[in-house]
């Protein structure tokens, strides 16, 4: 067994917060590597990649290549009953668009590591939707280099954490080109004794003038033993840029609870309605009806 370190912050903060990085145990000797998948913009239909297996440790590598002036839509459906590591690389050419939907389902005592890294050339765009549902631990590491002028990233994340589950997320928008844009939206619910870490970094490198980055997280807390850590980070080496971050974290307030109760909806049902909303808002960004149905079924089990 070896200790795999992931989700590193680009600029370290106080060590006692225990958020500079994350780690998990992995048995490389027992790991089975699945056949690599290469997806290009020549695909006429959306591409669905299903990842699962019976082995104790599984790794999967995926390349997504959008050529100049092309678009590609990819769904990555990862179902972990034991240990799965998925590594996705994105290459978005000039004026291209990549839409990526990441579905993370984990069974009890399972572990899923989802790593995405990529580069956007001039006027390229990556739109990503990531959904976290299940019972096991999930580590997600997402980094896009906005190298080309006017390139952009939009990231929407929804999660429900429960029992003693760990959800550790790291999103890094690396602004390199001029007039680049990033938008990171995270909405989630924590129940029972779930543990969640979200690290969102917007880094304006020298030369990224006239660029804009925004990140926002909303967290609903529905348990007494929850551990929630939200670390928004804006780094700036360029003067003429705009970076904003915000977070709303709290329990169901009395006014909202009264609104539901006055309509005959009890507290637990009201909490579940709001928890579902953090995921269901993302289904409006997903065109595949079967994928949406699968999400709804998972929600029924979780809530």
What is each of the regions a protein language model found here?
Residues 1-44:
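Long, low-complexity, mixed-charge
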Residues 19, 27, 208-209, 267, ...:
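Short cationic/low-complexity microdomains
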Residues 26-258, 262-265, 286, 292-303:
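Conserved beta-strand/loop scaffold segments within soluble protein domains that form the structured core
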Residues 259-264, 269-281:
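Extended amphipathic alpha-helical segments enriched in small hydrophobics
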